[in-house]
Amino acid sequence: MNPKDKRVNFGSMEPLIRDIGTVYEFYFDQNTFIESEIKTFLKEFETKRGDRDLYSLSQQTINANNTIVNINRSIHQSSQFLENINNNLNQINSKLSTQVENESIHQEQRNNDRLNKFELELVEKKSIEDSFNQRKSQIENDFNEKASVLRDKYQIVL
């Protein structure tokens, strides 16, 4: 016998391959089930996420509205306070300008007093110098007269 003749022929393999494919598909290929589970999970996730986003958006809207109310209240209060501050600043400014004017008047008076004092000192100095020069010339004249009298008396020749 020939080894080729010893082959056992079970017939066509197609039905066997089909049966194995069906068993594999049933037990191992879960793509359709997994896809439907994934789609369901994604729908639930997106729904929950949308709810969270809506809640977050509503909270942000509430916070923004509260912020706007606080800003408007602050603007109103600050406008009142700013008017008071502006009035106080105007009063202080007028007082300071009056004080500056008074100070400039006093400074001008002090400068005039200094100038007058300086002029008086100059006049007094000139008068003292004139008096000194007059006394000096008088003393020299007296000295010269007495020296001349003494020269004549003692007949001293210089």
Curated annotation (Swiss-Prot):
Cited InterPro entries: Bloc1s5
GO cellular component: BLOC-1 complex; transport vesicle
A Pfam family this chain is assigned to: Muted
Function text: Component of the BLOC-1 complex, a complex that is required for normal biogenesis of lysosome-related organelles (LRO). May play a role in intracellular vesicle trafficking.
Subunit structure: Component of the biogenesis of lysosome-related organelles complex 1 (BLOC-1).
UniProt family annotation: Belongs to the BLOC1S5 family.
Protein name: Biogenesis of lysosome-related organelles complex 1 subunit 5
Naturally occurring in which organism (per UniProt): Dictyostelium discoideum
Lineage: Eukaryota, Amoebozoa, Evosea, Eumycetozoa, Dictyostelia
